[in-house]
């Protein structure tokens, strides 16, 4: 395997996480301990196996896991999340829905650091059980957890945490390193075929979940070109097809070719 040089920066990691990272809180059953379930926060980065070399180089805290054609960096240690992950994203902020997911995740970790008794667990469950828009969790699976809690302790009164009351600073302005990370994860440089006059049309695209449409609108403002479309697959797409915009606005943004994925091999 040819050795590659990588250019990991703080803002690149944030952009890359915006594309292919996630903040997850699982609720695991346990046989021992006071509570029948416990929350387990995880920070996850996922890539196709072809990016194995990059992920191995990027890997610091956490562990590497392989799943079919994917490689994942998963950080579950509460100390690593508290001392490495949270300080990073506090200083190099995400955008849109993923920023909101991060703040819920952070709130859960801080609550776990401050106490592990019953009321915080119920607050955590109420706060983040349905955070992930693609979750398979249902009201029935949530009820099953609550039933086990109430069967053991009886009905417990607790004060729910309102997400809108959490302190969320504004995102920093977009910069080049963030853009490179975002495109490394969710961007592409393609050629399309137009039926009219059988034209070949180059295009630059970035795709996000529809809940993060605002991120693409920020990119549109940053590059001062392109359009944002909502697709039927619950995703939104930012696209630049105008050749003048591609040459004068998009290509100069990436002229230094600081990509860390195999997009570095693309000819821009």
UniProtKB/Swiss-Prot annotation:
GO CC terms: mitochondrion
Single GO biological process annotation from the record: intron homing
SUPFAM superfamilies recorded: Homing endonucleases
EC numbers for this chain: 3.1.-.-
Cell location: Mitochondrion
GO MF entries: endonuclease activity
Extra remark beyond the main annotation: Encoded within intron 1 (LRI1) of mitochondrial large subunit ribosomal RNA.
Family to which the UniProt record says this protein belongs: Belongs to the LAGLIDADG endonuclease family.
Biological function: Mitochondrial DNA endonuclease involved in intron homing.
Name the record gives this protein: Probable intron-encoded DNA endonuclease 1
């Amino acid at each position: 395997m040819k050795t590659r040089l990588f250019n990991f920066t703080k803002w690149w990691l944030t952009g890359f996480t915006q594309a292919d990272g996630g903040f997850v809180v699982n609720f695991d059953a346990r046989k021992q301990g006071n509570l029948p379930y416990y929350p387990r926060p995880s920070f996850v980065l996922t890539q196709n196996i072809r990016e194995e070399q990059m992920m191995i180089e990027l890997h610091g805290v956490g562990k590497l896991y392989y799943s079919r054609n994917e490689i994942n960096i998963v950080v579950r240690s509460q100390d690593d999340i508290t001392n490495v992950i949270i300080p990073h994203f506090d200083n190099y902020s995400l955008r849109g829905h993923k920023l909101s997911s991060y703040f819920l995740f952070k709130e859960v970790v801080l609550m776990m650091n401050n106490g592990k008794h019953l009321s915080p667990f119920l607050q955590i469950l109420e706060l983040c059980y349905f955070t992930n828009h693609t979750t398979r969790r249902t009201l029935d699976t949530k009820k099953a957890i609550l039933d086990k809690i109430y069967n053991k302790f009886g009905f417990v009164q607790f004060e729910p945490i309102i997400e809108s009351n959490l302190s969320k600073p504004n995102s920093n302005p977009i910069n080049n390193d963030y853009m490179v990370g975002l495109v490394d994860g969710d961007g592409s440089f393609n050629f399309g075929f137009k039926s009219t006059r059988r034209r070949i049309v180059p295009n630059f695209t970035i795709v996000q979940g529809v809940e993060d449409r605002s991120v693409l609108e920020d990119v549109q403002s940053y590059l001062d070109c392109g359009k944002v479309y909502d697709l039927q697959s619950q995703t939104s797409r930012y696209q630049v097809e105008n050749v003048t915009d591609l040459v004068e606005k998009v290509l100069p943004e990436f002229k230094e070719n600081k990509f860390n994925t195999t997009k570095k091999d693309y000819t821009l």
